[in-house]
Regions:
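Radical SAM [4Fe-4S] cluster-binding motif and immediate context
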Residues: 1-151
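Flexible glycine/acidic-rich beta-alpha junction loops that bind and position SAM and/or redox cofactors
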Residues: 9, 58-59, 126-128, 157-165, ...
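Alpha-helix termini
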Residues: 69-78, 176-187
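Short, surface-exposed amphipathic charged segments that create phosphate/polyanion-binding patches used
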Residues: 100-103, 204-212, 273-274
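Catalytic cores of alpha/beta
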Residues: 101, 161-176
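C-terminal, active-site-flanking charged/polar segments
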Residues: 134-137, 172-180, 193-199
């Protein structure tokens, strides 16, 4: 299903900014009517929203949850009789996103929220233009745990401005959030590979904003970029950090998406670079 199209955020690594069009949303009533139709006609009780975010409009998202709760009451159904999952953006209390809103979504049936956590560093998060802080993330995570809502973490290692200290903050976050893995409120984590510059993302068109340089005279793209102001962040270092993040998460019991396959690929690439046998881009990557 879809709640909306486009996105209200402008993360500079995401091509939704340019490919998704402007943000537009259905009303909470429209989405509720669709959910009600599939439940009453086909018995569907578990829904997944396939859009970039389900809570782009706090007003319509709250209205949807209120209508679900009203429906449960009118039909003598328990809270969370219907469940829904989808991509979700983090907001802080200063944006009007209240604890009562999270409590409402939990009772209505919010199940597994896919969230771009990306990093444990506010410095990196601000550089990404994520639009929220670590305190905001903690605020939502604490409430999710109280309201039986799960979080699926999307992480990003090796962003161009990520320093050793920033990466340590990511490791600290992974360690600190292990309590939510133990409680079942973190359903999994996807580390991806390492940070890549995708065509269509703002950073692809404006690498100068982070003063990035390409290699071989080309525009910075994929993993082929250099940040002269963060020169120790070589491709080898990015892979090293990415491996370290997964090894820690694995040790702490995080369910990791394609864990073995990703780790084997990363270790192979790291070894090729260390041995000087990564021939395809050997001149581009400095150890």
């Amino acid at each position: 299903m879809e709640f909306s199209r486009g996105c209200v955020r402008t993360c500079n690594f995401c091509d939704w900014v340019t490919s998704g069009g402007g943000f537009r949303t259905k009303t909470g009533q429209q989405v509720f009517t669709e959910v009600k139709y599939y439940y009453e006609n086909f018995g569907v009780r578990n829904f997944y929203f396939n859009d970039a975010l389900i809570n782009g409009s706090i007003k319509e998202f709250n209205a949807f949850n209120e209508l679900l709760l009203k429906y449960y009451t009118e039909n003598n159904l328990p809270n969370r009789h219907l469940l829904y999952s989808g991509h979700f953006i983090i907001r802080g209390p200063d944006t009007g996103w209240k604890k009562s809103d999270i409590e409402r979504m939990g009772k209505a049936g919010a199940d597994n929220m896919v969230v771009g956590v990306e990093t444990g560093s506010d410095h990196v998060r601000k550089s990404m233009n994520k639009g929220y802080t670590l305190a905001d993330l903690d605020y939502n995570m604490e409430m999710f745990a109280k309201c039986d809502i799960k979080l699926y973490m999307l992480m990003m290692v090796g962003y161009p401005t990520e320093t050793d200290n920033d990466f340590q903050q990511t490791l600290d976050l992974i360690t600190r959030y292990q309590q939510y893995v133990a409680s079942g409120n973190i359903s999994g984590v996807n580390f991806g590979q390492t940070f890549v510059i995708e065509e269509g993302a703002p950073i692809f068109y404006h690498p100068e904003e982070l003063e990035l340089q390409g290699v071989d005279g080309k525009t910075p793209h994929d993993v082929f970029w250099i940040n002269p102001k963060n020169s120790t962040l070589t491709y080898k270092e990015r892979i090293k950090r990415r491996i370290a993040a997964q090894e820690l998460a694995n040790k702490l019991g995080y369910p990791i998406w394609r864990a073995d396959g990703q780790l084997n690929w990363l270790m192979a690439k790291y070894q090729e670079i260390a041995n000087g046998t990564y021939n395809e881009h050997k001149t581009r990557i400095q150890s």
